[in-house]
C-alpha cells in the first residue's frame, strides 16, 4: 500500500512538473521552438525517434505542433491568433502535409462564441455556437 501511495505521489509530481514546463513555454516569449526526442533500447540497440516539434510566436502562443509516431508524422497542426491571443484558426494536416480540415473561431469580449469546421475543400462540416450566462 505504501508503494502504491509513493507511486501515485511521484506520478502527480511528475505530471505537475511537465504541466508547468509546458506553461513556461506559453508565458515565455523567448522560446521559438521545442523538439522532443526519445531514445528506446531494444535488445541493446538504441533507436532514437523524434517525438514532437512545437513552434511558438513571440507572444508564446503555439503556432505549429507536429507529433511523431516511431519517427513518422502522426499529427500536424498549425494555429493563428488575433491581437488578443485568441486562437482564430486551426489547421490539421495529414502525414504528407495536405490540409485535412480547418477550424475558425470567433470571440466576443474574450469569450469564444463560434467554431466552424471546414473540410479540405472549405466546405462546412460543422458549426458550434457558445452562449454564456453571466452574473
Identify the role of each PLM range.
Residues 1-25:
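Bacterial Sec-dependent N-terminal signal peptides
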Residues 21-135:
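Buried hydrophobic residues that stabilize the cores of well-folded domains
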